[in-house]
UniProtKB/Swiss-Prot annotation:
The lineage of its organism: Bacteria, Bacillati, Bacillota, Clostridia, Eubacteriales. This is Large-conductance mechanosensitive channel. InterPro entries: Mechanosensitive_channel_CS (IPR019823), MS_channel (IPR001185), MSC/AndL (IPR037673), MscL_channel (IPR036019). The gene is mscL. Keywords: Cell membrane, Ion channel, Ion transport, Membrane, Transmembrane, Transmembrane helix, Transport. Belongs to the MscL family. Pfam families: MscL.
Amino acid sequence: MWKEFREFAMRGNVIDLAIGIIIGAAFGKIVTSFVNDILMPPIGLLLGKVDFTNLYINLSGKNYSSLADATAAGAPVIKYGVFLNSIIDFIIVAVAIFLVVKQINRLKKQEVAAAPTTKECRYCKSEISIAATRCPFCTSELLDTGRPLK
């Protein structure tokens, strides 16, 4: 069982997947930092010095000066500012992944269709080698060699 697991884990696809997950997690942290620390502060400044991470709806009915105070008091809140940051974060990651996949697909070479290796016997309709001059099933002589007889 250990040998089978080792063979499975050492296949190229599993290792590629693990590397992709690690790089994806690191990329996600970079995008989150970009959104929270670089993108949202200027947008908040343009919208009247709004800190999006501090936008919330207090459901308890009491007044709190900040989201941190409401959370510390255990008040139920809807953190829509944090949610907006998460949406922007997701959009940036989705666009980046779309652009990468689009480039990879563009750079992939179009695979050429393989030449046929079999043909159909015109007499018994069996599938035979394309190079056959006589059908191994009905023993009919085939005059057309090298191309399908379908």
